[in-house]
């Protein structure tokens, strides 16, 4: 039998300190019969109504004028479905009592959550609109094992933490309450009394929608339906296919011309998708779109990991954007940030008064570079929260891949730390073993549950096996950004051509380790901010030379083994650094303003993408020595490089680059196969605003030995240019 309700228990509800509401509220069996107890602050009267018949059963006694009611139904021994008729002054309202509903989380779910092995915890935790016993409402669940009390507050209860305290499940540390009549679109938060007795107001870590900053509430939103992976999308992600990625920051790609405000997801779809298709990119990569509080972080300090940012519209609108990309044959990659989170008080920091998501010791849990907190990957629930988030974006929005940010900062405990500022692992080493295991687990989950989706690592060190299968000891990524190639080649391109001969190895060294990983060649947003200048701004020389250098570099990059990534604005050589608060400088494409230079680069990138997609030698064997051969690698004095790309069926393309402003006429290059070679690309073409030096469309080999080969071709290599010569097969 249930014990009597004491005044101390009642006071606990009104000072919002009662952590076990179901022990008191709802229906309880007593010697006299079923006793019903309700808490409704400021109510005057309360009548119990049988839900099925609508019959009045009894009026409850007000035992505390603040709004606590108790009544016994004599001789009643069975629980039944009931409603409450509440009188607020002279007005009456019929409501459902959330404390008459049984727990909806079962023992297996609790065990899986605690073990961290539930594949999709977002199907259980968070806010889920549903129906229970014929009553519609929202089931709220929150993991906060050390909180003394948790209440749900929101639009539905005047944000009053006294009204809806939640049920605690000690097996899992999960708090739960089904709130009848709560509905989609309503705002909510969790009000906690933490383990120290402090009051905290927290957004839902599993919220599917969140308010736009500076507001911080979560919003009840439907869990999106699963988007099935198609064979076409799978094929486009494979390593033997052409992958050319257009990296986009949605807030600054284009803006409203009248007020400089963002376009929404649908407007972006109308403009971005046709543009990307026309330019020949195969993939779009979005900078992070999980909800984040600070615009200046570009999304790399997220708090609402399960909420597409409301800056550009609703979650459903983002799904439409992805769908539009798929309809155009374009795959979508999303930047994903599991490495750290900001310390905003409504977020994950000290969630229940303890370091729940982060490490307690700042030597493990504080990121000095970004003033953020580092996840505790060794905690089962945290690891599962993160790894399942990757699966959520892939399954529920149809995203085709994720690019994991700042992997090096995750896998090394001493990353950006001086001696004494970090804690070694259990073996005394610098590797973060828990983070490494987390990455392996996440990639396993992605590849086992969403076959065909890809993961890409931004990993800036020489950590071995980033793209090797996790079962073979690798991290399990599909691709890794080739930061070494990017840094070396950009350092070379910044040099005055006079000095390039002394740094020739910067353009060739990448082939020493080319086959150690599966690489993406990235010219990303990081290279055009914080005083680094734009790509065009990095190039030496006058205007003609700057543009010629950039065109030659792009030609070299698209010919070099590895998938391609180009940040928005670089496709038309924007002159200033990227500014996240403004649109790109599209006006430069007006020839009256840009003089045709920028449009020439735009045309080149479009042609590079088209040639890349149509010619198997340029992509099929990126990760095999069979697909590449240096023809001229040692001509540092002339800053000339030449290599051959091959496909599995014997097709061949020779890539020749001249990184000086001196044209090289009658330059002889040994070739592996005799025949005619047609010039399919020349970055010095007048079509791209070049000087139009070339080879009249074709060159034929001669039986003249050169570079250790019996046959050779004599070519004209334009100044500061790259040309592609394809072996004719007919």
Curated annotation (Swiss-Prot):
Signal peptide segment: none
User: What's the catalysed reaction?
Assistant: Transfers a segment of a (1->4)-alpha-D-glucan chain to a primary hydroxy group in a similar glucan chain
**GO MF terms on file?**
1,4-alpha-glucan branching enzyme activity; cation binding; hydrolase activity, hydrolyzing O-glycosyl compounds
What keywords would UniProt list here?
A: Carbohydrate metabolism, Glycogen biosynthesis, Glycogen metabolism, Glycosyltransferase, Transferase
Q: Where is the active site?
A: 405, 458
**Record's keyword annotation contains Transferase:** yes
Q: Tell me which EC number(s) this protein carries.
A: 2.4.1.18
- A Pfam family the protein falls into: CBM_48
Q: Please tell me which top-level EC class this enzyme sits in.
A: transferase
Q: Name one GO cellular component term.
A: cytoplasm
Q: In which pathway does it act?
A: Glycan biosynthesis; glycogen biosynthesis
Provide a GO biological process annotation: glycogen biosynthetic process
Is Transferase a UniProt keyword of this protein? yes
Q: Which family does it belong to?
A: Belongs to the glycosyl hydrolase 13 family. GlgB subfamily.
Q: How does it assemble?
A: Monomer.
Give a short account of what the protein does: Catalyzes the formation of the alpha-1,6-glucosidic linkages in glycogen by scission of a 1,4-alpha-linked oligosaccharide from growing alpha-1,4-glucan chains and the subsequent attachment of the oligosaccharide to the alpha-1,6 position.
User: What is the protein's name according to its record?
Assistant: 1,4-alpha-glucan branching enzyme GlgB
Q: Which organism is it from?
A: Haemophilus influenzae (strain ATCC 51907 / DSM 11121 / KW20 / Rd)
Q: What broad taxonomic lineage does this protein's source fall under?
A: Bacteria, Pseudomonadati, Pseudomonadota, Gammaproteobacteria, Pasteurellales
């Amino acid at each position: 039998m249930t014990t009597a309700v004491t005044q101390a228990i009642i006071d606990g509800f009104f000072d919002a300190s009662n952590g076990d509401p179901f022990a008191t509220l709802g229906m309880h069996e007593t010697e006299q019969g079923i006793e019903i107890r309700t808490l409704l602050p400021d109510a005057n009267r309360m009548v119990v109504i049988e839900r099925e018949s609508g019959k009045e059963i009894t009026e409850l006694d007000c035992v505390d004028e603040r709004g606590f009611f108790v009544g016994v139904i004599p001789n009643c021994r069975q629980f039944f479905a009931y409603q409450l008729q509440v009188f607020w002054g002279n007005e009456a309202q019929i409501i459902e009592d959330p404390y008459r509903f049984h727990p909806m989380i079962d023992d297996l779910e609790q065990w899986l959550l605690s073990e961290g092995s539930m594949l999709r915890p977002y199907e259980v935790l968070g806010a889920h609109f549903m129906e229970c016993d014929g009553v519609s409402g929202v089931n709220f669940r929150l993991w906060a094992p050390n909180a003394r009390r948790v209440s749900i507050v929101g639009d539905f209860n005047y944000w009053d933490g006294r009204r809806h305290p939640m049920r605690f499940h000690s097996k899992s540390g999960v708090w739960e309450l089904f709130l009848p009549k709560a509905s989609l679109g309503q705002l909510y938060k969790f009000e906690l009394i933490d383990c120290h007795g402090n009051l905290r107001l927290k957004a839902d870590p599993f919220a599917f929608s969140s308010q736009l900053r500076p507001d911080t509430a979560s919003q009840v939103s439907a869990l999106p339906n699963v988007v099935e992976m198609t064979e076409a999308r799978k094929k486009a992600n494979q390593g033997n296919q052409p992958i050319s990625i257009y990296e986009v920051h949605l807030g600054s790609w284009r803006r409203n011309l009248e007020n400089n405000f963002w376009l929404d997801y649908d407007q972006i779809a109308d403009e971005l998708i046709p543009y990307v298709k026309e330019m020949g990119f195969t993939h779009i990569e979005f900078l992070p779109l999980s909800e984040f509080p600070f615009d200046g972080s570009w999304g790399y300090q997220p708090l609402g990991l399960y909420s597409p940012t409301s800056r550009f519209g609703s979650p459903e609108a983002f799904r439409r954007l992805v769908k539009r990309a798929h309809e155009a044959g374009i795959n979508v990659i999303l930047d994903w940030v599991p490495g750290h989170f900001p310390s905003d008080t409504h977020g994950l920091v000290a969630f229940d008064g303890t370091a729940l998501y982060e490490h307690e010791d700042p030597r493990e849990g504080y990121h000095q570079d970004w003033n953020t907190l580092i996840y505790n990957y060794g905690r089962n629930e945290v690891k599962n929260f993160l790894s399942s988030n990757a699966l959520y974006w892939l399954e529920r929005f149809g995203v085709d891949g994720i690019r994991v940010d700042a992997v090096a900062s995750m896998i090394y405990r001493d990353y950006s730390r001086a001696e004494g500022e970090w804690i070694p692992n259990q073996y005394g080493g610098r590797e973060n073993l828990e983070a490494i295991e987390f990455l392996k687990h996440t990639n396993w989950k992605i590849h086992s549950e969403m076959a065909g989706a890809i993961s890409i690592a931004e990993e800036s060190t020489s950590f071995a096996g980033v793209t090797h299968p996790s079962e073979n000891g690798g991290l399990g990524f599909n691709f890794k950004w080739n930061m070494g190639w990017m840094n070396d080649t950009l350092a070379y391109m910044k040099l005055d051509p006079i000095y390039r001969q002394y740094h020739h190895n910067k353009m060739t060294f990448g082939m020493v380790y080319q086959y150690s990983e599966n690489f993406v060649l990235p010219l990303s947003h990081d290279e055009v901010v914080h005083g680094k200048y734009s790509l065009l701004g990095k190039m030496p020389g006058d205007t003609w030379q700057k543009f010629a250098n950039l065109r030659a570099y792009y030609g070299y990059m698209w010919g070099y083994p590895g998938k391609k990534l180009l940040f928005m604005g670089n496709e038309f050589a924007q002159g200033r650094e990227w500014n996240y608060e403004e649109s790109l400088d599209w006006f430069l494409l007006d020839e009256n303003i840009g003089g045709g230079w920028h449009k020439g680069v735009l045309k080149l990138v479009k042609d590079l993408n088209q040639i890349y997609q149509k010619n198997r030698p340029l992509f099929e064997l990126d990760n095999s020595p069979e697909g590449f051969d240096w023809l001229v690698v040692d001509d540092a004095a002339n800053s000339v490089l030449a290599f051959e790309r091959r496909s599995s069926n014997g097709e061949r393309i020779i890539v020749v680059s001249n990184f000086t402003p001196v044209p090289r006429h009658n330059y002889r290059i040994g070739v592996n196969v005799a025949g005619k070679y047609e010039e399919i690309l020349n970055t010095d073409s007048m079509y791209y605003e070049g000087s139009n030096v070339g080879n009249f469309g074709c060159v034929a080999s001669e039986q003249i030995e050169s570079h250790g080969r019996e046959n050779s071709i004599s070519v004209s290599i334009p100044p500061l240019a790259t040309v592609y010569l394809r072996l004719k097969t007919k």
